[in-house]
């Protein structure tokens, strides 16, 4: 199933381009720059006129993590009014990068109810029953669209049939939560290519409770439980983008020999030909839209095995293509940006300066991928709050009503004044 995107609605107004430019500029300013560059800034951003190809792979209920985010935001607002000692963290400011998931530690110190211990035990039993109800054995394995790890084997649905829960996967890297260990053993393939009846909400696929290295903190029963609305919906989509989006950056290249900052050379960098082919989730709940990239699609580009570089020119024309599947540099579970081209404008310089330009380009490409991974790759996401528009409309309506009421009062006052004037003239 696929649908068309009215891309022109995004490009007519330059507000979105300006917002993204400011966001990227702020992110680049927050990173630590190497000694050979300074004053990095994003000068221009444009979405382009070519929309991405979007294919719907699955329709179901939103992940529970999205509801937890809304609840945590609500608890945060209450905590800010009562006390600032609550250790709550907003997911919109970025999740805990070290833990690898978006659950927050909630410190609830209310001691009003003396029977909370019994309620906690009952709640734990209900949580265990809920996990059993979402057994992954009900999800059928379909067509394998993604190839996360050639050395690992994807378990079939039959392998889970005799057990109440799937076996624990061995972590690929003990020092961090690799996304392979979350997705691959539990079959994101089954979401993408499932053909039979299965669980309508495959949230356990991304449930970190199955990881041996991590344990989700228990949410206090005093917190409000997630409220599911009948209109809530989630789409698992395949996004294939090969458009004309471009980013312009300005940076100073430093030559630190024979002394630090001996030469400062401004360089203009034009980032174009961005290629994205990934699986993402788009969830709509309570007038909020959540977007998160889950994993990359394994394409078979003929020139993906090696970096391609065109001959550089001493006149400043420097074109370099960067690909994301170089085994020596790419060990992340997701890159989002698969291919990117950078054109640099530096004028007539020596060859040793050109070599430093290559370092700058590679640094910027890696930092751009890191920003996208940290901000919009699972377990991070971006949330677009649609309630702000409703609030603005309500304020406009109230303002119009107030203006209309004042106008009526002015009209009545005018009539009353005219009457008095007539009486005065008649008396005279």
Curated annotation (Swiss-Prot):
Its membrane topology: Peripheral membrane protein
Biased composition (Polar residues): 146-161
GO biological process: one example: mitochondrial genome maintenance
SMP-LTD domain segment(s): 1-387
Reported function: Component of the ERMES/MDM complex, which serves as a molecular tether to connect the endoplasmic reticulum (ER) and mitochondria. Components of this complex are involved in the control of mitochondrial shape and protein biogenesis, and function in nonvesicular lipid trafficking between the ER and mitochondria. MDM12 is required for the interaction of the ER-resident membrane protein MMM1 and the outer mitochondrial membrane-resident beta-barrel protein MDM10.
Domain notes: The SMP-LTD domain is a barrel-like domain that can bind various types of glycerophospholipids in its interior and mediate their transfer between two adjacent bilayers.
Protein name: Mitochondrial distribution and morphology protein 12
